[in-house]
């Protein structure tokens, strides 16, 4: 048997909070044992039942067996590796390519130190961080799109 706390509605601080919609839920049921013992197992068992039902109704196919002699001409990685793949593909020296990849997190680590005087959270009032983000996004998209093209068109994206 849970003990529920009754609010003191004569308290002016609580009345001001309730008027603004900031009060706590004093009128509801306690979370223990009602939520944890009754509602959570229903949600968990319902999720498991949905997963089992989908697995029975729509099983995923295993696919064709792998044929090592029938590989494509150019193997592409997953989409999230496209920028890294493009760097390694276009830079002639592999050590330079690895150093370029290491320089990205190193450059991102320096941004807070470059802008440590600026305490604003608004991105329009933090020009260094906003510029680094925009340039990094454009470069990542450029490299990602270029990785899907042939090597001759990959740097210019076929525009020039």
Swiss-Prot record:
Keywords: Chloroplast, Electron transport, Membrane, Photosynthesis, Plastid, Thylakoid, Transmembrane, Transmembrane helix, Transport. It is found in: Plastid, Chloroplast thylakoid membrane. GO terms for molecular function: electron transporter, transferring electrons within cytochrome b6/f complex of photosystem II activity; electron transporter, transferring electrons within the cyclic electron transport pathway of photosynthesis activity; oxidoreductase activity. It is a multi-pass membrane protein. It comes from the Eukaryota. One of its GO terms (cellular component) is chloroplast thylakoid membrane. The chain crosses the membrane at residues 36-56, 95-115, 131-151. GO terms for biological process: photosynthetic electron transport chain. Belongs to the cytochrome b family. PetD subfamily. The 4 large subunits of the cytochrome b6-f complex are cytochrome b6, subunit IV (17 kDa polypeptide, petD), cytochrome f and the Rieske protein, while the 4 small subunits are petG, petL, petM and petN. The complex functions as a dimer. Component of the cytochrome b6-f complex, which mediates electron transfer between photosystem II (PSII) and photosystem I (PSI), cyclic electron flow around PSI, and state transitions. This is Cytochrome b6-f complex subunit 4. The gene is petD.
């Amino acid at each position: 048997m849970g003990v529920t706390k009754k609010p003191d509605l004569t308290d002016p601080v609580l009345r001001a909070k309730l008027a603004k919609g900031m009060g706590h839920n004093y009128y509801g049921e306690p979370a223990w044992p009602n939520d944890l013992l009754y509602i959570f197992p229903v949600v968990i068992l319902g999720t498991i039942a949905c997963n089992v039902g989908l697995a029975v109704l729509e099983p995923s196919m295993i696919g064709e067996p792998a044929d090592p002699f029938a590989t494509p001409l150019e193997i592409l990685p997953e989409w999230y590796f496209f920028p890294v793949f493009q760097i390694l593909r276009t830079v002639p020296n592999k050590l330079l390519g690895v150093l370029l990849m290491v320089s990205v997190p190193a450059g991102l680590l320096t941004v807070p130190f470059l802008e440590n005087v600026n305490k604003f959270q608004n991105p329009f009032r933090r020009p260094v961080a906003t510029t680094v983000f925009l340039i990094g996004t454009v470069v990542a998209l450029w490299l990602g799109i270029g990785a899907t093209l042939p090597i001759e068109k990959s740097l210019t994206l076929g525009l020039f």
